[in-house]
Curated annotation (Swiss-Prot):
This is Kinesin-like protein KIN-7E. GO terms for biological process: microtubule-based movement. Keywords: ATP-binding, Coiled coil, Isopeptide bond, Microtubule, Motor protein, Nucleotide-binding, Ubl conjugation. There is a cross-link at K734 (Glycyl lysine isopeptide (Lys-Gly) (interchain with G-Cter in ubiquitin)). It comes from Arabidopsis thaliana (Mouse-ear cress). One of its GO terms (molecular function) is ATP binding.
Length: 862
């Protein structure tokens, strides 16, 4: 017998992982027969058991259709069914789990006078008898059974084994949960000792008489049996484990109505406390049945605090709901059935509680102590020398690494010095060229001669975008305004019919043209065109003279970038440094008056001079080549952008014109300068990217913007202009935020608080897309990769908060970019996003009716 029991225990310990599985609470319903009072009162029985799992309400006409008439559970018992059968069908297996090291609980729930105490007394007696029978049959293990009993009376905990009625305190134990302090715990000697203790508990428990029950329980009673088992002989570490678990027999007080129980005084107070604790228990059960959503208020009642491990924790649980079939108790019976319906949806996860025996622990500690003593007595010199050699090699590697870093820093210092010298020369050149520049004569929207401005490259500082809180964040974009009125057209617009309207500016976003890689590529492929950063406007003169366009070179000569455009739809907007505070925040300008610009001054050869102009501040002073294609349209003098581009392509395809143009704008000299400084571009790119990652985190930049930028610009020399512009933009934002200033985004004030709020809103949006873009297995792998517990709450929001949270970790940046790219479907958009990155992807600003009509009239010119 003992050998068989030992083998069974070994199998049980090996299958411990399988035992620790989720299972639902076992719910049994017992319908008692009518008692003598109900029979004398001619009460009708409205409830009956139609089979072993269903309870039916027969009087459906009285209640209507608001409630179901049938309820199904694990087992249902009629009034004539004995308690032994109720115990054998379900609670027996749950109770005997305690001898296998699994916690278990059995409790009765129902209204007053429904038979809870009667049922629990029988179940407790049968369960304890089976536990002792199991102990007597398994002599190869030593069992220790401890008994304790408490009651909760008016929210005060009393020890039923102690004559002292002093309330006991609850304390939180990290392993056992809520534990009662100083509760008496008796070690059982035999079966007779247990019966004596149960008799003491029945005598100590609070019992009162009401109109519904002569012996009504006025408190919740909890009887706890703790079973600890271990092998009688030390047969090795694997056979020396100790199992310890507990089983709780809980007899709850019944819910009652004061109007039916006719209670008053002390009985009324007792009923209030009973109903309040049962209400808290029902709330906890209902929340657990809904998948543990929201906060579960275990601490609202001492009953729920003690039962917390039994409700959805490390325990197997069985609930016996007792019902009264009388018609006068229909509402109370229905509430009990609703509680049972919620309870059967609650899941628990019980596991075997294994405790290492003291003998095995002592043996292990003795071996560890002997090993440490031997190491102290016999030190190994060879190992020490080996350790010294390893340490020296590590130091040498560190020295080599530091030498490489020193060489890299020296190289960066030399590059910075050379750039500083070039910048100083550039400043001197700008200062010397300011002598021939005209000044502003009148700050109005017209030139001095009354004609409308011919320049279309004027930057509106209020429309300069710094950070976008949408799904895509473009670079700083300056929108060019085209004013295309002559004096006659202006007078026509200011007719009496429009006298009350304010004059409007007609805007058009124009494409930006950049420099080609070389003149030879232009001659070989007629489809390629040069892109300048900003396309200037048209000539507003009525005689149709040839207009001129101005090409603006970026501010840093070393960041010049030449690209090839393979389609006419690939457009880029010019990037610019943020406007000065004097331009954006100047309060002395009257409302309605914008910037006024000086007369255009042309040099020899029809070249437009831009030295010391408002749009060239901080950039190189360059000259734009005059294009021989007429830019003035036939109707109203409106420039045709398409005809301008066609003329530009024809001009560039001419070797003589292209050479002249390259000579005028200084491309040959710039190529030599750029080729010398871009040799170490890969190292410079890594350094600048690290700075950008840090500035993104500091300025709370949009995650989608970070992902687009990180994936599009991967270190190509052609990406240098984007890297430089982004770095300058972020540096400006950081400086503004650190000084307490603000930036502007489409006419709105942007602060660090608003950026942080937009970032939080974006993270919540991305968390909602996790379930749509990733499968269950993919989400589980992502949670493990980002260090999120699989069983934790709000895992998707945790994942969104982890994205782009480590600016100094490039591996984390790569993983974050991959996740965000899939969430926003960046991969499906293709590489065309790189050509469009400088454009604003947000909806355009609303246009007025007159501006819309002007745009419709422009359609014929394109």
């Amino acid at each position: 017998m003992g050998a068989i029991a030992g083998e069974e225990l070994k199998k049980m310990e090996k299958t411990q992982v399988h035992v620790a599985r989720e299972e639902k609470i076992l719910v049994l319903v017992r319908l008692r027969p009518l008692n003598e009072k109900e029979i004398l009162a001619n009460e009708a029985a409205d409830w009956e058991c139609i089979n072993d799992t269903t309870v039916l309400y027969r009087n459906t006409l009285r209640e209507g259709s608001t409630f179901p008439s049938a309820y199904s559970f694990d087992r249902v018992y009629r009034g004539e069914c004995p308690t032994r059968q109720v115990y054998e069908d379900g609670p027996k297996e749950v109770a005997l789990s305690v001898v296998k090291g699994i916690n278990s609980s059995i409790f009765a729930y129902g209204q007053t006078s429904s038979g809870k105490t009667y049922t629990m007394s029988g179940i407790t007696e049968f369960a304890v008898a089976d536990i002792f029978d199991y102990i007597f049959k398994h002599e190869d293990r030593a069992f220790v059974v401890k008994f304790s009993a408490i009651e909760i009376y008016n929210e005060a905990i009393r020890d039923l084994l102690s004559p002292d009625s002093t309330p006991l305190r609850l304390r939180d134990d990290p392993e056992k949960g809520a534990a009662v302090e100083k509760a008496t715990e008796e070690t059982l000697r035999d079966w007779n000792h247990l019966k004596e203790l149960i008799s003491v508990c029945e005598a100590q428990r609070k019992i009162g008489e009401t109109s519904l029950n002569e012996r009504s329980s006025r408190s919740h009673q909890i009887i706890k049996l703790t079973v600890e088992s271990s092998a009688r002989e030390f047969l090795g570490k694997e056979n020396s484990t100790t199992l310890m678990a507990s089983v709780n027999f809980i007899d709850l007080a019944g819910s009652e109505r004061a109007s039916q129980a006719l209670s008053a005084g002390a009985r009324l107070k007792e009923g209030c406390h009973i109903n309040r604790s049962l209400l808290t228990l029902g709330t906890v059960i209902r929340k657990l049945s809904n998948g543990r959503q929201g906060h579960i208020n275990y601490r609202d009642s001492k009953l729920t605090r003690i039962l917390q491990p039994c409700l959805g924790g490390n325990a197997r649980t069985a609930i016996v709901c007792t019902l009264s079939p009388a018609r006068s108790h229909v509402e109370q019976t229905r509430n009990t059935l609703l509680f049972a319906c919620c309870a059967k949806e609650v899941t628990t996860k019980a596991q075997i509680n294994v405790v290492m025996s003291d003998k095995a622990l002592v043996k292990q500690l003795q071996r560890e102590l002997a090993r440490l003593e031997s190491e102290l007595r016999n030190p190994a010199p060879a190992t020490s020398s080996c350790d010294c050699g390893v340490t020296l090699r590590k130091k040498d590697l560190q020295i080599q690494k530091m030498e490489k870093q020193l060489a890299e820093m020296t190289k960066q210092r030399d590059i910075a010095q050379s750039r500083l010298e070039d910048f100083m020369k550039m400043v001197e050149h700008d200062a010397s060229s300011k002598a021939g520049t005209p000044h502003f004569r009148n700050r109005t929207n017209k030139w001095e001669d009354g004609s409308v401005s011919e320049i279309s490259g004027v930057v509106d500082p209020d429309r300069t975008s710094f950070i976008s809180d949408g799904t895509s964040t473009p670079l700083s974009t300056a929108r060019a305004h085209v004013r295309s009125h002559s004096d006659d057209d202006l007078e026509e617009e200011m007719s009496p019919r429009h006298s009350g309207d304010q004059s409007e500016e007609y805007c058009k976003e124009v494409q930006c043209i950049e420099m080609e890689e070389s003149t030879r590529d232009i001659n070989n492929d007629s489809e390629e065109r040069t892109d300048a950063e900003t396309l200037l406007g048209h000539n507003a003169e009525a005689n149709g003279e040839t207009g001129s366009a101005q090409h603006r070179i970026p501010s840093s000569v070393r960041s010049v970038r030449r690209r090839k455009s393979w389609s006419r739809g690939d457009t880029m907007t010019g990037t610019s440094t943020p406007p000065d505070a004097l331009e954006t925040d100047y309060r002395g300008r009257p409302e309605g008056h914008g910037f006024a610009f000086p007369d255009l001054e042309f040099g020899s050869g029809g070249k437009l001079l831009r030295n010391d102009s408002m749009t060239s501040r901080g950039s190189d002073s360059t000259e734009a080549h005059s294009i021989g294609t007429p830019l003035v349209g036939e109707e109203g003098g409106i420039t045709s952008i398409r005809s301008f581009v066609e003329g530009l392509k024809e001009m560039v395809s001419d070797p003589e014109n292209s050479g002249k143009m390259r000579k005028d704008i200084g491309v040959d000299a710039m190529e030599e300068e750029v080729s010398g400084t871009m040799t170490n571009w890969s190292e410079e790119f890594e350094r600048q990217r690290e700075q950008i990652l840090g500035l993104w985190q500091t300025c709370h930049v949009s995650l989608v913007h970070r992902t687009y930028f990180f994936l599009l610009f991967t270190g190509d020399q052609a990406d240098s202009i984007y890297i430089g512009v982004e770095l300058r933009r972020l540096s400006f934002m950081k400086e503004s935020f650190s000084q307490g200033n603000h930036a502007f985004e489409r006419g709105q004030t942007l602060t660090i608080a608003s950026s942080l709020k937009a970032l939080h809103r974006e993270r919540r949006m991305l968390s909602k897309l996790v379930g749509k873009r990733f499968t269950g297995e993919e989400r589980k792998r992502l949670y493990q990769k980002f260090g999120i517990a699989v069983n934790s709450k709000r895992r998707r929001l945790q994942l969104a908060n982890q994205l782009w949270s480590k600016p100094n970790d490039i591996t984390h940046a790569v993983e974050s970019a991959a996740v965000v790219a899939k969430l926003v479907r960046f991969v499906e958009q293709g590489r065309a996003m790189k050509e469009m990155f400088g454009l604003s992807f947000t909806p355009p600003l609303p246009t007025t009716r007159r501006s819309l009509n002007w745009r419709k009239s422009m359609a014929t010119l394109f």
